[in-house]
Amino acid sequence: MASPRTVTIVALSVALGLFFVFMGTIKLTPRLSKDAYSEMKRAYKSYVRALPLLKKMGINSILLRKSIGALEVACGIVMTLVPGRPKDVANFFLLLLVLAVLFFHQLVGDPLKRYAHALVFGILLTCRLLIARKPEDRSSEKKPLPGNAEEQPSLYEKAPQGKVKVS
């Protein structure tokens, strides 16, 4: 049976991956929701207006929206389907992307309800990355003492009068 850690990582990976595939697709095409697509277009226009540096670099709202959407779809697919290290790399890129989106929302002065989802999914991405990068805990296995393990007493052996003997 899989460990709880593995189940948690897989569940978070699939849920986050599907969410980002969905959100990235909304940024790329109006087929899923015309209203959400229109809202994304409007939001990205305000982001570019609020950050003139993007305009100077030749990045317009369409390019920004489509590049972020494509990155979300690609990383979401990796998070959902690809095993191993690429999943952690996709997680890291999505976390950076969420931080950039939070920056954009703050820059234009959006209320919390407009970017609460980004905050929650940023926290979930952070949790998934921390759980995935934490080494497996093997404390349940007994580690032999150096030398001959039978000759060395344990640290807390029972003494004859019920006292704990510490060596």
Swiss-Prot record:
UniProt main location, coarse: membrane
TM region positions: 6-26, 62-82, 89-109, 115-132
Gene Ontology biological process terms in this record: chaperone-mediated protein complex assembly; positive regulation of protein localization to cell surface
Record topology, Cytoplasmic segments: 1-5, 83-88, 133-167
Subcellular location(s) of the protein: Peroxisome membrane; Cytoplasmic vesicle; Endoplasmic reticulum membrane
Record keyword Membrane present: yes
One MF annotation (Gene Ontology) recorded for this entry: acetylcholine receptor regulator activity
Ranges for region Disordered: 136-167
UniProt membrane topology term: Multi-pass membrane protein
A GO CC annotation given for this chain: endoplasmic reticulum
Record flagged with keyword Endoplasmic reticulum: yes
Entry keyword set: Chaperone, Cytoplasmic vesicle, Endoplasmic reticulum, Membrane, Peroxisome, Transmembrane, Transmembrane helix
Topology feature Lumenal, residues: 27-61, 110-114
Interaction with NGFR: annotated segments: 43-54
Assembly, per entry: May interact with NGFR. Interacts with RPN1, RPN2 and CANX.
Annotated function: Molecular chaperone which mediates the proper assembly and functional expression of the nicotinic acetylcholine receptors (nAChRs) throughout the brain. Essential for the proper folding, assembly, function and surface trafficking of alpha-7 (CHRNA7), alpha-4-beta-2, alpha-3-beta-2 and alpha-3-beta-4 receptors. Stably associates with ribophorin-1 (RPN1) and ribophorin-2 (RPN2) (components of the oligosaccharyl transferase (OST) complex) and with calnexin (CANX), both of which are critical for NACHO-mediated effects on CHRNA7 assembly and function.
Family membership: Belongs to the DoxX family.
Protein name per Swiss-Prot or TrEMBL: Novel acetylcholine receptor chaperone
